[in-house]
Amino acid sequence: MSISFDLTIDDTRDQLARHARASLEAKPSLIGMSREEMAEALIKAGVPERQVKMRISQLWHWLYVRGVSDFADMRNISKDLRAMLAQHFTIARPEVVEEQISQDGTRKWLFRFPPRGAGRPVEIESVYIPEEGRGTLCVSSQVGCTLTCSFCHTGTQKLVRNLTSEEILAQLLTARDRLGDFPDKDTPDGAMVPAEGRKITNIVMMGMGEPLYNFEEVKKALLIASDGDGLSLSKRRITLSTSGVVPEIYRTGDEIGVMLAISLHAVRDELRDILVPINKKYPLEQLIKACREYPGLSNAKRITFEYVMLKDINDSLEDAKLLVKLLQGIPAKINLIPFNPWPGTNYQCSEWEQIEKFADYVNAAGYASPIRTPRGRDILAACGQLKSESERMRKSERLALEAMMIAGHGE
């Protein structure tokens, strides 16, 4: 049995009016700024230049180590400076519209971010997956997606916009809040989390969107997440998943240096063109070449290849043989993902016996090929199932909501 908490207020009109006021009063967030950007912003706000380096150090500690979301809690900063910071900036968390808890302990949050410019509030989903000794947060990089992968639920939602570095990091910060993963924060009773250490040990850019189509903001967010003075996550514990944006794979290795995962799903171009249409632009030969040249590959730093198991589509023994041949010489792990059904799909999950035969062949060839245990299926939180709640509404409901938003924004 799953549990769902609808955290929205009852009166939608009041909620939309609040968003309208927020858009008019919008202040830049310090969350997600690089040190250079923060220095420029602080000087512009009136912080003496000689103090800027010290103030940045203090702010990073409070934002990313202590996890505060109110300037008033920054106790080693003077009251006057806290007031000045609050006047010019925000460090508020996004609205948590809904929290769903699966029977297996997986948690899914629906976040709502305020309007940007003349836009509307947007919603995205993040998922927390607890396991023995680790807790993984699946983070979104876009509202919707442009890739239209035929087996993926997110691919049925049109791209609304890219998320900012602030909005990407806000998913991690808010999840840590709600799991009690910051000092002085309590873990919810009964929550499934690692028994010791951090509640969130790993992050994966595998939520809504294609991270490499939002490269600069994703890069900024991940460099802060891995900064020793920031959230201090090892780059070995951060995985970026891409459907194959080849030029940015090279940039990811050179400029970010996190672990790489490839949404592969097919070993023949003619099939991958259908399942993952970006393959028409960057076919398998180009994709695999970029993988072979990814910096620092070794048995300790392997590329993960994700392969969704689709009945009678890509699950034959011949597909397994071609997969092994395709990846020959690349330090790799192959995650076999039982297809997670969603409303309206025409695909079916492979038979379990066939998945095991496929895995056995790949294992025998020397590649680790774990079969991923489906997590959070009962709350549509499993791989390929994410989609903004507002996008699940009937068209008439969505148009009514948008009309109210327009009225609330005075457009």
Swiss-Prot record:
Q: What positions constitute the catalytic site?
A: E125, C383
**Annotated disulfide bonds:** C138-C383
Q: Where along this sequence does the record place binding of S-adenosyl-L-methionine?
A: G209, E210, S241, S263, L264, H265, N340
Q: What class of enzyme is it?
A: transferase
In terms of SUPFAM superfamilies, this protein maps to: Radical SAM enzymes
Catalysed reactions listed for this entry: adenosine(2503) in 23S rRNA + 2 reduced [2Fe-2S]-[ferredoxin] + 2 S-adenosyl-L-methionine = 2-methyladenosine(2503) in 23S rRNA + 5'-deoxyadenosine + L-methionine + 2 oxidized [2Fe-2S]-[ferredoxin] + S-adenosyl-L-homocysteine; adenosine(37) in tRNA + 2 reduced [2Fe-2S]-[ferredoxin] + 2 S-adenosyl-L-methionine = 2-methyladenosine(37) in tRNA + 5'-deoxyadenosine + L-methionine + 2 oxidized [2Fe-2S]-[ferredoxin] + S-adenosyl-L-homocysteine
Name the record gives this protein: Dual-specificity RNA methyltransferase RlmN
What is the organism field in this record? Brucella anthropi (strain ATCC 49188 / DSM 6882 / CCUG 24695 / JCM 21032 / LMG 3331 / NBRC 15819 / NCTC 12168 / Alc 37)
